[in-house]
Amino acid sequence: MARSKATDPPADLLGPVQGEVSWFCCGTAWGPCSSTGKGACGTCNSGSLQHAWPNTSDACWSITRPDRCGVSLSRRTCGYRHRVTALCSGASVVTAIADCGPQTDLFCGERSCCGATCADNRLIDLTPAAYSQIASLSSGLRPVEISSA
């Protein structure tokens, strides 16, 4: 869901926001992922129900910049739990922040759809374990609603 230009620092997330979800690898090898770094929080693992959020710190925000896509997202730090609900199926998963990302400003206006149901802007990355709870990893991107758990 597009919001007006964000202020700096961004306004608090007043309710659910819609956007795209993708998936990423972190930590120990799992499924399609080889071993890699543990993410900005130092706890990220591909086999855990975790996610990356674009506003975990000032340093993170300076890289991801969802405000450049017209989206204002609240500051949430490591361990904060979000519920991610697939707009296509209604399936949802609760995950904890374990990394900074995605770099939203690289994907402004990007859109994913299932039929006539669409969402814009890549706002959250799930680990493969979490993403596979709401969609097939082969789908790559899906429209979702993100809310506090």
Short names for language-model regions:
Residues 2-149:
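Secreted/periplasmic proteins
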